[in-house]
């Protein structure tokens, strides 16, 4: 089993090269028309399986379609990756939508709503005391 340093190094290399493939080699208008970014790569300890989490400025429905398109094109992406990097075996890849950003934004929205509600409540209390 490779050490953490090797996992991080290979993950970083995969992220860099897959980003370049998405930007330059992949001929998919949906992916090119929306800002698609790789947010995280989970690489298995044996370097055989790779989960690639993507973020995009697109709406959730479009992001789902982008992920489907990427998973449809994963064999050609993997083939291009094999030409770019020297590895004994290029890992099997699967693309997933990274929903962490959406969850974070919804939490911030809830916090803002609570803050506004609390401020309105404090103003009403001050008015009632006057």
Swiss-Prot record:
Record keywords, A-Z: Cytoplasm, Ribosome biogenesis
UniProt record similarity statement: Belongs to the RbfA family.
GO CC annotations on file: cytosol
Protein name (record): Ribosome-binding factor A
PROSITE patterns linked to this entry: RBFA (PS01319)
Any one GO BP annotation for this protein: maturation of SSU-rRNA
Assembly behavior: Monomer. Binds 30S ribosomal subunits, but not 50S ribosomal subunits or 70S ribosomes.
Spans through the membrane: none
GO MF terms, alphabetically ordered: ribosomal small subunit binding
Location(s) in or outside the cell: Cytoplasm
Pfam families listed in its UniProt record: RBFA (PF02033)
Organism domain of life: Bacteria
InterPro entries attached to this UniProt entry: KH_dom-like_a/b, RbfA, RbfA_dom_sf, Ribosome-bd_factorA_CS
Keyword Cytoplasm part of the UniProt annotation: yes
Functional description taken from the UniProt entry: One of several proteins that assist in the late maturation steps of the functional core of the 30S ribosomal subunit. Associates with free 30S ribosomal subunits (but not with 30S subunits that are part of 70S ribosomes or polysomes). Required for efficient processing of 16S rRNA. May interact with the 5'-terminal helix region of 16S rRNA.
């Amino acid at each position: 089993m490779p050490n953490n340093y090797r996992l991080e190094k290979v993950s970083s290399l995969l992220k860099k090269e897959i980003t370049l493939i998405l930007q330059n080699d992949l001929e998919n208008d949906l992916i090119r028309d929306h800002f698609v970014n790789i947010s995280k790569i989970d690489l298995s300890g044996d370097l055989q399986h790779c989960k690639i989490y993507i973020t995009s400025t697109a709406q959730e429905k479009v992001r789902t379609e982008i992920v489907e398109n990427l998973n449809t094109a994963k064999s050609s992406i993997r083939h291009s990756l094999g030409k770019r990097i020297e590895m004994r075996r290029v890992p099997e890849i699967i693309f997933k939508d990274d929903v962490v950003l959406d969850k974070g934004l919804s939490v911030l929205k809830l916090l803002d709503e609570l803050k506004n509600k609390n401020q309105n409540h404090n103003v009403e209390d001050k008015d009632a005391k006057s």
